[in-house]
Design a protein with these regions (language model features):
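N-terminal single-pass transmembrane signal-anchor helix
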Residues: 1-31
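Acidic/proline-rich low-complexity IDRs
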Residues: 7-9, 69, 100, 124, ...
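Extracellular/periplasmic head regions of type IV pilus-like filament subunits
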Residues: 56-112
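Compositionally biased, intrinsically disordered low-complexity segments
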Residues: 22, 47-50, 86, 109
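Low-complexity, S/T/G/P-rich flexible repeat/linker segments used as non-globular hinges
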Residues: 109-131
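Membrane-proximal N-terminal amphipathic helix
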Residues: 35-62
Length: 131
């Protein structure tokens, strides 16, 4: 009686391991994107809350209005004027803030007249982040 595996048994094991690895790889990448979306949703909620906090602080000293900028004076870190350490994965251009997730991106616009921080809900990434 021979001890060991036949070539056919080894091929089956390799094929099964390949299938399992491909399924696991897809799940890992999807989980990573879900985590980044969750962090961005948290950032957006913090930013909106920070805008309201600045508005309330302005009211306490007799100035009625939303902050004119979401950054501290002279700072290049997005949102450090409304949340403590700013936010990662965001870039700023004027009053527009871009969040990138892989090859997709969405632009949020801050309107200091009414304190809104929002994006175009026709984009799927915007809906994933705000709804």
């Amino acid at each position: 009686m021979r001890r060991g595996f036949t070539m056919l048994e080894l091929v089956f094991v390799i094929v099964i391991l390949g299938i399992l690895a491909s399924v696991a790889g897809v799940k890992i990448f999807a989980t990573r994107d879900d985590a980044l979306i969750s962090r961005a949703r948290s950032d957006i909620a913090s930013i909106r809350g920070g805008i309201i906090n600045k508005y309330n602080a302005n009211m306490m000293v007799g100035r009625f209005g939303y902050p004119s900028s979401l950054e501290k004076s002279g700072s290049s870190v997005p949102f450090d004027g409304v949340i403590q350490n700013g936010a990662k994965d965001w870039t700023k251009s004027g009053n527009d803030y871009t969040f990138k997730l892989g090859s997709r991106s969405v632009v949020f616009t801050y309107d200091s007249a009414n304190g809104t921080f929002d994006c175009s809900h026709s984009q799927s990434l915007c809906r994933a982040l705000t709804e």
